[in-house]
Amino acid sequence: MEEEDARVPTLEPFRVEQEEEEYLLRQVFNAPKPKWTQLSGRKLQNWGGLPHPRGMVPERLPPWLQRYVDKVSDLRLFGGLPANHVLVNQYLPGEGIMPHEDGPLYYPTVSTISLGSHTMLDLYEPRQPEDDDPVEQPADHQPAPQPRPPPRPTTSLLLEPRSLLVLRGTAYTRLLHGIAAARVDELHATSLPPNAAACPSARPGACLVRGTRVSLTIRRVPRVLRAGLLLGK
């Protein structure tokens, strides 16, 4: 197995202090209303530009975000190049996001700072072709087939407030990731998350109640339109 393929999700030695967390949350919630986009199960802000297959039109990041983009870039997660895009997500208790992949518009590494509350990030194997096979219709007087159960995550990571998670290698390019729409996460002694040793709250039998969580997803968009192209030069 190649080194890149062996990489797994990690919690980097990067920590946001409580005062910094409070400052960042104030900046997020003080953003102009037009900056917010409401989706099913979350709302978000886009900073740095809107990624597009033909190239992202770059926008200057505000100083309060640029400081943390620089700190993450100093970890050299993006091939030695700086991050240039931040997606801010807000999740209320009971909200989540379906399993998905971030796709080819980004450098194959994603870093996420969690603020305000913990969550559980679920990782899934990609769907197989047989998962999409149509269900056969039952013959007359035969019981209807049972619906296929929803996919089960292969593992789940505890993301504590003020931590930085990094997904790269096959964890980014192959696995899907999502957040279950839950209000409480129960940690059982027999199934603690694999990163439990790095999480003070990951105690056997713990019942972690979710609050409002804000995530700063910091990435690099490789394809950026130059100013000359925008002006038609």
State where each predicted segment sits.
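Non-heme Fe(II) oxygenase metal-center motifs and adjacent flexible, charged/small-residue loops
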Residues: 1-233
